[in-house]
Amino acid sequence: MMDVNVYRVPMGSPDDVSELEKLIDEGTVNPFEICAIIAQTEGDGYSRGYAALCFELMLSEKMHMSRAEVAARIPMLMIGLTGGLMSPHYTVFTRKEVEAPENSEKRLALGIKITRVLLPEEYGTAVQVKLVAEAVKEAMAEAGITDVADVHCVEVKPQPDPRQAGRRPEPRQDLLQHQHRRGGLQD
């Protein structure tokens, strides 16, 4: 059986991973049992990458592995712009296998699946919907969930394509020509 724990931790700034480090140092959280981190950071879109970097650096030190290994092992969903609506914080999910209790009551379960990196033109299309649906089915199986009615939360966040980093996609000529014929673009 899976034992899942959730830790909601305050975050003073996008680089503040001190509370998680404290939980690890105290033995409350085993870094090798961390299976996901969701953070709501302050700041703009750049703060999300900065926060992920800070988690990767601290966890790579605690787990004695490279940043890349941490990133491949622990999905990190970073959301920016708290904008005064909520306090910056992060949620750490841990899981480990334990012996099943005698009763069979339903309890918190967690399945994680990451799709392949989508091409820029695939976002918002049936391709993305199909990939997410397949990933949800696989995550349900991993979590031991057989009835979709027992699924209460699915987090979806597009992963940036590293091949596109710092590049804007080339404009599609067919769309530009169509827009030009409609009189939307001027020569």
Region locations from a protein language model:
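Terminal domain-initiation and capping elements
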Residues: M1-D187
